[in-house]
UniProtKB/Swiss-Prot annotation:
Name assigned to this protein: Uroplakin-3a
Glycan-modified residues: 74, 139, 170
Region (Disordered): 243-287
Cytoplasmic side: 236-287
Transmembrane segments annotated in the record for this chain: 208-235
Source species: Mus musculus
Length: 287
């Protein structure tokens, strides 16, 4: 049903006059959380500028953004010669002093749009979203990168009212061919104060409480286990030293030494009789 509604909305865009059209927020079918604190997703002007007849030549669509003010509905995005403005986010203080060019993309012909029936296909979802949507404020690094050369689309300011406008530019002449009206004011989300965040455990489920308790006590058990491992290692080292000392004492006692003589004692060598006894024994044999 939502896909049929989206197709019907695109068909209605073809029936309307270009001067009466405004940029619109993306449908919840494509962007569920929109706007965010720093981004706004808009529907691209599909079948808007070429609704009456196909365009011949090379065209691009420029998207301009500015902070809402009393005069923002009448602000022009081109000079007196019809050349579109090239002002940047930095030059306009984030759109507060005037409109800046937030995005630029090729104009896709109506007949070349991807089918919305495949929006549920994960492999084609990114392509379809890029074809139908443009997101303002999705580049968080270009503003702080001094070497960035492309079109910078920095994050928007939270809780701020913005307006947007599409401009069709003929790339052959570099002049504005057509443009939409400024959009209605669109607010970015407001950050939730810390005091408003509900931290009462009574509103949490039983599973959340159990998981939180386990995670909270896990460091204590790890610390106890680590301390026990250190103590056991010291105990094992002490018992090993005692055994080595006992063995060395037994070895020393097993090798006695004769007092009053300098002859070394070898416990493992079978020594013969003394020299005087050997001489007596040999004399008896001769007799």
């Amino acid at each position: 049903m939502l896909l049929l509604w989206a197709l019907l909305a695109l068909g209605c865009l073809r029936c309307g006059w270009t001067v009466n059209l405004q940029p619109q927020l993306a449908s919840v079918t494509f962007a569920t959380n929109n706007p965010t604190l720093t981004t706004v997703a808009l529907e691209k002007p599909l079948c808007m500028f070429d609704s009456s007849e196909p365009l011949s030549g090379s065209y691009e669509v420029y998207l301009y953004a500015m902070v809402d003010s009393a005069m923002s509905r009448n602000v022009s995005v081109q000079d007196s010669a019809g050349v579109p403005l090239s002002t940047t986010f930095r030059q306009t203080q984030g759109g507060r002093s005037g409109p800046y060019k937030a995005a630029a993309f090729d104009l896709t012909p109506c007949g070349d749009l991807p089918s919305l029936d495949a929006v549920g296909d994960v492999t084609q979802a990114s392509e379809i979203l890029n074809a139908y949507l443009v997101r303002v404020g999705n580049n968080g690094t270009c503003f702080w990168d001094p070497n960035f050369q492309g079109l910078c689309n920095p994050p928007l300011t939270a809780a701020t009212e913005y307006r947007f406008k599409y401009v069709l530019v003929n790339m052959s002449t570099g002049l504005v061919q057509d443009q939409t009206l400024w959009s209605d004011p669109i607010w970015t989300n407001r950050p939730i104060p810390y005091s408003a965040i509900d931290t009462w455990p009574g509103r949490r489920s039983g599973g959340m409480i159990v998981i939180t308790s386990i995670l909270g006590s896990l460091p204590f058990f790890l610390l106890v286990g680590f301390a026990g491992a250190i103590i056991l290692s010291f105990v094992d080292m002490g018992s090993s030293d005692g055994e080595m000392t006992h063995d060395s004492q037994i070895t020393q006692e097993a090798v006695p030494k004769t007092l009053g003589t300098s002859e070394p004692s070898y416990s493992s060598v079978n020594r013969g009789p003394p020299l005087d006894r050997a001489e007596v024994f040999s004399s008896k044999l001769q007799d």
